[in-house]
């Protein structure tokens, strides 16, 4: 019976229904508890407080941990499906690396800045938030999207690793260039990489290596169904948490959503189509083109939130 329920989650025709339901549940939770009235705790700070023995149970802290748990549930299954030897092959992909680096650092931040100027010039907080969102390439969700789209998973991981290194150097430069004299701890980028990429990668690799070694490939093939299910549940759970964080604000100021949805939708559609076609015309196959497209399009909301909290007011 439980497996039948899980199989419904694998039906991609039903996925939009589950996504909308998760968003609705999140908004209801946010409205019920008035969560946006609380100070938002950065997920990494909540993790640190646990290790330091200073964690206090509260709605913001619990939701902060929910983001970490949800992202781990999404990324870990994708990592577990990666073979060590495939990672080695993916490192020998100079064309893919060049396309992603070019679009991520020569196009994406400035394209997002242009969209912010066009649609949000009269809303300084929303303008700043959107520009911040455009600075950092994604280091988590793109692996999940590549995985769900049957793209080249090992290549996606290598591209994410490249982005992780480059953005630690360039984000402070781009932030000052596009937003003026702002100050934040660049280590928030490194911490995000370790938490959202490093931890699931290690756990996934150990699961595959130790599981196959002890139980065999057939066991792992059976496990894959449940790993895929975990990834989808993680996606839905993360949506609930993210919409709960600002559920009451969404209902009070729905135009915020409309104002941000237009430039963000334009950004994602235009960027993905242009990058995918560039990769395709460059001779890459579907799997590589998908991995390149998502890696050059996805943005890192975790890093954007961390910078916004440390360098700007809560509205941003």
Labelled PLM ranges:
Residues 1-316:
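Alpha-helical transmembrane segments of multi-pass small-molecule/ion transporters
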């Amino acid at each position: 019976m439980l497996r039948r329920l899980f199989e419904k989650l694998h039906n991609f025709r039903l996925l939009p229904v589950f996504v909308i339901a998760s968003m609705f549940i999140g908004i209801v939770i946010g409205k019920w508890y008035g969560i946006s009235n609380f100070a938002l705790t950065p997920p990494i700070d909540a993790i640190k407080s646990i290790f330091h023995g200073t964690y206090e149970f509260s709605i913001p802290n619990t939701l902060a941990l929910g983001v970490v748990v949800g992202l781990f549930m999404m990324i870990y299954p994708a990592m577990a499906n990666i073979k060590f030897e495939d990672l080695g092959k993916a490192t020998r992909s100079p064309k893919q690396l060049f396309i992603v680096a070019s679009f991520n650092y020569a196009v994406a931040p400035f394209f997002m800045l242009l969209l912010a100027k066009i649609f949000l010039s009269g809303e300084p907080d929303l303008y700043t938030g959107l520009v911040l969102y455009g600075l950092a390439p994604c280091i988590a969700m793109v692996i999940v999207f590549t995985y769900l789209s049957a793209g080249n998973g090992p290549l996606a991981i290598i591209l994410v690793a490249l982005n992780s290194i480059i953005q630690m150097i360039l984000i402070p430069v781009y932030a000052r260039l596009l937003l003026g004299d702002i100050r934040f701890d660049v280590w928030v980028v490194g911490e995000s990489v370790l938490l959202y990429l490093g931890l699931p990668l290690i756990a996934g690799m150990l699961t595959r290596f130790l599981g196959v070694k002890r139980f065999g490939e057939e066991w792992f093939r059976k496990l894959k169904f449940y790993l895929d299910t975990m990834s989808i549940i993680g996606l839905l759970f993360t949506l609930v948490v993210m919409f709960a964080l600002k559920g009451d604000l969404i209902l009070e100021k729905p135009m915020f959503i409309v104002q941000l949805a237009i430039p963000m939708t334009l950004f994602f559609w235009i960027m993905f189509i242009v990058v995918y076609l560039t990769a395709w015309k460059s001779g890459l196959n579907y799997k590589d083109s998908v991995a390149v497209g998502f890696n050059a399009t996805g943005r890192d909301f975790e890093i954007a939130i961390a910078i916004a909290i440390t360098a700007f007011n809560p509205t941003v």
